[in-house]
């Protein structure tokens, strides 16, 4: 049976996420995380897809992307295949690394975009990390500093929406306080 067509976002923004097959760990160490970010950065640049936010957890990842040319499917296929080949070769395993086809949810408004940004950056806190500042495997620092130390994330479009780094950090602390 064919799969349903994916929803197309009018804004070009999407929430993209996937997890390990059977919830297995897909990032064993920092070298795996660096490799995944490199694969995403390289393949997305080739396909003109911009990463606006990201977060890597041990068994899953979240991305917020801008896909103005409808190239996300090809970019994800290339990036996830490259990473799966690397990880399977490194660990001596075979078969599917990821649970299923990645998930993609259309983001249709600035309000939804900010909510997604919050969700992505607060994901490590839900995973028992003490503070956002202490967790290095997300784009939070790009929003806190105004530039991405990993050079993968373009924070500028969302910082324009939220009123800059300082306002976003204050907003995120307020949101975190309401949730926890």
For each of these PLM feature ranges, what is it?
Residues 1-53, 57, 66-180:
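Short Pro-Cys-Gly-centered "Cys-loop" motif that presents a nucleophilic cysteine in a tight turn
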């Amino acid at each position: 049976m064919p799969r349903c067509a994916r929803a197309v976002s009018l804004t070009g923004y999407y929430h993209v996420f996937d997890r390990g097959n059977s919830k297995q760990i897909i990032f064993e160490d920092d070298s795996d995380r660096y490799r995944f970010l490199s694969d995403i950065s390289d393949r997305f640049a080739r396909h003109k897809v911009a990463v606006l936010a990201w977060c890597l957890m041990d068994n899953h990842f979240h991305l917020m992307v801008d896909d103005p040319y409808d190239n996300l499917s090809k970019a994800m296929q290339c990036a996830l295949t490259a990473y799966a080949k690397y990880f399977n070769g490194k660990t001596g395993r075979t078969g599917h690394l990821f649970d299923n086809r990645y998930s993609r949810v259309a983001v249709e408004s600035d309000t939804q975009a900010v909510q997604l940004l919050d969700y992505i950056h607060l994901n490590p806190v839900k995973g028992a990390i003490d503070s956002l500042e202490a967790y290095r495997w997300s784009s939070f620092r790009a929003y806190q500093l105004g530039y991405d130390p990993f050079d993968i994330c373009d924070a500028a479009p969302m910082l324009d929406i939220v009123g800059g780094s300082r306002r976003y950090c204050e907003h995120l602390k307020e949101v975190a306080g309401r949730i926890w």
